[in-house]
From Swiss-Prot:
SMART domains registered for this protein in UniProt: Aspzincin_M35
Propeptide, chain numbering: 20-179
Keywords: Cleavage on pair of basic residues, Disulfide bond, Hydrolase, Metal-binding, Metalloprotease, Protease, Secreted, Signal, Zinc, Zymogen
Residues holding Zn(2+): 308, 312, 323
Name of the featured protein: Neutral protease 2 homolog UREG_02006
Lineage: Eukaryota, Fungi, Dikarya, Ascomycota, Pezizomycotina
SUPFAM superfamilies: Metalloproteases ('zincins'), catalytic domain (SSF55486)
Top-level taxon in the UniProt lineage: Eukaryota
Biological processes annotated in GO: proteolysis
Family matches, as Pfam families: Peptidase_M35
Length: 357
């Protein structure tokens, strides 16, 4: 998991209203080393070493070892962050498959190589600084339940990029031709009916959440966003109101919704994803295994996931959110800045005020 530009944009947007430490996770700071090296122009190799005394098993999603074009590094030029043009995934922390984990013995290293020009426009060329900071989710024993985190901070690597060569790197995310609000090819029959109901559920969730953010219970808002600043409450309500508008029509909107994985990014355990730069949302096969409607608790249903994905879409509300944490336990550990920029905090809040959780 990587902290990146949209997180900083939201923090800057609200300034002193969120003047809290950026990271207050309860997690390990020792035992993990990450080194980035250049493999030529825009190709980068990341080597992760377990310097601890125990074997670790970590979740690959949203890390260097994720085969999908998720954000793996932060790229800066002349002090400015380069926008990320890949995908944001949603997965259910309560249902992670064993194949989504990677194991590292004490002293062992694992490496991954990728091209940063596949998810960022580096065609101007010149000098760039590449780094990565975040955490790995650690599973306990031989299971798949996340029991801890290990923070890391890589070296800062300087790259002198040939812009012409970078421009020739194929984008990891093909551009689709937008024809309709809901893709008619993938959203036929039962999928189309279920998605229509999911949009209705999304509208209901977001509508109640907008009202609760505007003038609802202060303690409940504090629980999910770690502040009761009027400025923050106004911003959260505005995002929910924008989502209500997006969910209210199956024919008009700012996003394109795919009921199937046209890009072939889905893996076991992944439920849905958003491509913010294209305003595209796509469901994975696991999405259709979720219950269409959940009336109690905070577990995801179809409408919950739509709210989550729509918070990522900058065309609906800018800046879009990121994925600092998933599920109630992780999201409760986020500070105010992270909570405001985290997609699942919005879905959880919407579910809580709608279901009385």
């Amino acid at each position: 998991m990587l902290f990146s530009s949209r997180f900083l944009a939201l923090a800057a947007l609200l300034g002193q209203a969120l003047a809290l430490p950026i990271d207050d996770f309860s997690q390990s700071d020792a035992g993990l080393k990450v080194k980035l090296t250049s493999m030529g122009n825009t190709r980068v190799k990341a080597v992760v070493t377990n310097e601890g005394e125990q074997e670790i098993s970590f979740l690959k999603f949203n890390t260097f070892f994720d085969s999908a074009p998720t954000q793996k590094v932060q790229i800066m030029k002349a002090g400015s962050l380069i926008p990320f043009s890949g995908v944001d995934f949603y997965f259910n922390m309560a249902n992670l498959p064993a194949e989504a984990f990677k194991t590292l013995a004490p002293g062992a290293s694992a490496e991954a190589e990728f091209d940063i020009a596949a998810t960022a426009d580096l065609s101007p060329g010149g000098s760039y600084t590449v780094s990565s900071a975040g955490f790995l989710r650690i599973a306990g024993g031989n299971g798949t339940a996340i029991t801890g985190r290990m923070r890391y901070r890589s070296n800062q690597m300087k790259l002198n990029v040939d812009g012409d060569m970078a421009a020739k790197v194929q984008s990891a995310v093909p551009t689709i031709e937008k024809r309709t609000r809901i893709d008619g090819n993938s959203c036929r029959g039962n999928y189309g009916q279920l998605l229509s109901r999911a949009l209705q559920g999304c509208s209901s969730y977001a509508g109640r959440a907008a009202q609760a953010a505007s003038n609802g219970d202060a303690q409940k808002f504090q629980e999910y966003f770690k502040t009761n600043s009027p400025q923050v409450r106004q911003s959260v309500a505005a995002r929910f109101q924008a989502i209500v508008q997006e969910c209210s029509s199956a024919s008009n909107g700012k996003t394109t919704y795919l009921c199937e994985d046209r890009f072939r990014f889905c893996q076991p355990g992944l439920i849905a994803y958003t491509i913010p730069t294209q305003s595209v949302v796509a469901n994975c096969p696991s999405y259709w295994k979720l219950p269409p409607v959940v009336n109690r608790g905070l577990e995801p249903d179809h409408g919950y996931v739509v709210v989550h994905e729509f918070t990522h879409a900058t065309s609906i509300f800018s800046p879009g959110t990121e994925d600092h944490g998933y599920g109630y336990e992780e999201c409760r550990r986020l500070n105010a800045q992270q909570s405001l920029s985290n997609a699942d905090n919005y879905s959880l809040f919407a579910a809580a005020v709608s279901r009385g959780a």
